[in-house]
Structures are given as C-alpha cells and as structure tokens.
Swiss-Prot record:
This is Glycerol-3-phosphate dehydrogenase [NAD(P)+]. It catalyses: sn-glycerol 3-phosphate + NAD(+) = dihydroxyacetone phosphate + NADH + H(+); sn-glycerol 3-phosphate + NADP(+) = dihydroxyacetone phosphate + NADPH + H(+). Its EC number is 1.1.1.94. The lineage of its organism: Bacteria, Pseudomonadati, Pseudomonadota, Gammaproteobacteria, Pasteurellales. It comes from Actinobacillus pleuropneumoniae serotype 3 (strain JL03). Its main location: cytoplasm. It comes from the Bacteria. Coiled coil: none annotated. GO terms for molecular function: glycerol-3-phosphate dehydrogenase [NAD(P)+] activity; NAD binding. It is found in: Cytoplasm. One of its GO terms (biological process) is glycerophospholipid biosynthetic process. Sn-glycerol 3-phosphate binds at residues 111, 140, 142, 196, 249, 259-261.
C-alpha cells in the first residue's frame, strides 16, 4: 500500500456520523484519529472502544484512535474531515485555523447551510481559511448506523482540487461496502445534502397526518424540482440532483425512520410542537435550522420553493400542519 493510501486522517466530530466515518476509514486500513469537543466523553470512548451513546455495540477498529487534544489531532495529519452540525461549522474552522500548515487539506461531511445567512459551507470555509487549502465535501445517502456496521453504502465526493479528490476517493472507497463517486459540482453536492433535510420534514409531516404514499411521493418529486431550481440559480449542474447527493439522499431521508428530519416531521404531523419533537429525538435536527436558511437563500435567489416556504411558515411563523397542507394542495394549476 502506497503512502498516499496509508496517510492518517483526523475526523473532527464524535457524533453518530463522525464516528461512523471514522470507523469506516479505520476499517479500510487507515490510521484514523477521532476528536470531539468534550474531553470527558472522549475518555469514555477511548476506554470502551465504542460510542455507546450513538452507535452501541459497534467496536472501534484497531486503527481508530481517540484524540482529545485538538492541537495534536491537527498536527498528526495532513487530511482533516469535519463532521459537526452546520451551526458550529464556522466555529470549528475558526478553532483550527491557527493550527493549520500549508500542507493541510480540509474535507467535510456536514450537511447544511450557514445559520441565519443561507450561505453554502464552502463559502464559509473560504471566508475563514482563505483559498490556500484544498477543500472537499462528502455527501450522499448514508445513515450512520448502517455505515458503521459495514452495510453497503454509496456516496458522492466533490473537491476544489482534483488530486485531493482522487486520493480521498481511493482512501475511502472499499469495494466490499463503501462506494465513492467523484462529482466535480461542489455547489450541487452541498445543496442537495442541505435542502433534502427540509423536504424530509415535509414528508414526515405528510405521513404523520396520514396522507399516504401518494402524497409522500409527490412531495419527494416536487421537492427535488425545488432543489433543482435553486441549484440552477446558483450554477449547479442539474445532473448532480439525479445522483447520490441529490435524489439518493432525498429518497433515503424522506422514507426511512432512521432520519431525524423525517421523524421530526412525523411528530409535527401528529400534533407535537417543534420543541417537543426535538426533545424526544435528543439529537440535532439539521432540517429545523436548514428550513430558515433554505427559505432565505430562495428569497435571495428569487426562486419559488413552495414546499420549503410552507414548512418555514409552520416552523417559524406559527402556521399549523393542516393549513400548510391546504396551502400546498390549493396552489394554482400549472404544468409540471
């Protein structure tokens, strides 16, 4: 195995998805350091050799090492994979900026938009770090538990640097379980991963109200159209939204109850408040925050996104689920 393949990786973020990606990398034979912002919890992970809070009974591979010191976590590697909630993405970049050297390369698997602005995370990264570091994004239909268990999974990888993309594809890709597709459309890959969370809330609301499979499928289909329109306004490639980071992630998130966003929507459709639903889920529901950012971005771009708009009205303006459904179903007749 060449040095390119065996170079170590640091994963920043020890939640379910960050841990799962660290497990997948380590299982593939690469020295992997996993860092989290709470040293006492990282000490438990190091002792138990698993993340029982998020991925119980899935043992860490020998190549996975817990690192609670951020300085060391950055100093030991060239390649950094950030897997934190979108609302702290900028904070993590600000933390690591003084620790970076010219050789570092940054990738993230965070799905979302910048809080209160709707900006793509690539824009945030370039604003904080400048343009001297190769950047990449990993996105697609991946539930953390299945990935950590080694079940077959496929994902998309896009980068500003073709060499970085090629090397990370070869490092992550595992012919037995984890397939990585390269995509040169960073805008589309980021956008698909963020907006699908909002549509998944809508699908959950629909199912929670008992509207059935026909309505769910219509929401997914029209949701994809909304994502594609927004992507076109930002210069994304329309083909991206038919791939892993678009349709793939959208279908997965809208149809399986492993999705926090879908479960959140289900509870809303059943009459629970947003606060009650989030408390019951007990983890970050990215789509709750992404809804506001997606709505802001659509307004900025002048793009019509009725599903996103109605979910925004429900979450942030007090509109109830029945009125949301009535508004969507009562829209004027139009061509597809």
């Amino acid at each position: 195995m060449s040095e390119m393949y065996s170079a170590p990786v640091t994963v920043l973020g020890a939640g379910s998805y960050g841990t799962a990606l660290a497990i997948a990398l380590a299982r593939n034979g690469h020295k992997t350091y996993l860092w989290g912002h709470q040293p006492e919890k990282m000490a438990v992970l190091a002792t138990e050799r698993m993340n029982n809070a998020f991925l119980p009974d899935i043992a860490f591979p020998d190549a996975l090492e817990i690192e609670s010191d951020l300085v060391q976590a950055i100093a030991k590697v060239r390649d950094i994979l950030i897997v934190v909630p979108s609302h702290v993405f900028a904070d993590v970049l600000t933390q690591i900026k003084p620790l970076l050297n010219a050789h570092h390369r940054i990738m993230w698997a965070t799905k979302g938009l910048e809080r209160n602005t709707g900006r793509l995370l690539q824009t945030v990264a370039q604003e904080i770090l400048g343009n001297q570091y190769p950047l990449a994004v990993l996105s697609g239909p991946t539930f953390a538990k299945e990935l950590a268990q080694g079940l077959p999974t496929a994902i998309a990888l896009s980068s500003t640097d073709s060499q970085f993309a090629d090397e990370m594809q070869q490092r992550i890709h595992c012919s037995k379980a984890f397939r990585v597709y390269l995509n040169n459309d960073m805008i589309g890959v980021q956008l698909g991963g963020a907006i699908k969370n909002v549509i998944a809330i809508g699908a959950g609301i629909s199912d929670g109200m008992g509207f059935g499979a026909n309505a769910r499928t219509a929401l997914i289909t029209r949701g994809l159209a909304e994502i594609s329109r927004l992507g076109a306004s930002l210069g994304a490639n329309s083909n991206t939204f038919m791939g892993m980071a678009g349709l793939g992630d959208l279908v997965l998130t809208c149809t399986d109850n492993q999705s926090r966003n879908r479960r959140f929507g289900l509870m809303l459709g059943q009459g629970k408040s947003a606060e009650e639903a989030m408390a019951e889920i007990g983890q970050v529901v990215e789509g709750f925050y992404n809804t506001k950012e997606a709505y802001l971005l659509a307004q900025t771009q002048g793009v019509e996104m009725p599903i996103v708009e109605q979910i925004y009205q429900m979450l942030f303006c007090g509109k109830n689920a029945h009125d949301v459904a009535t508004s969507l179903l009562g829209r004027e007749r139009k061509g597809e």
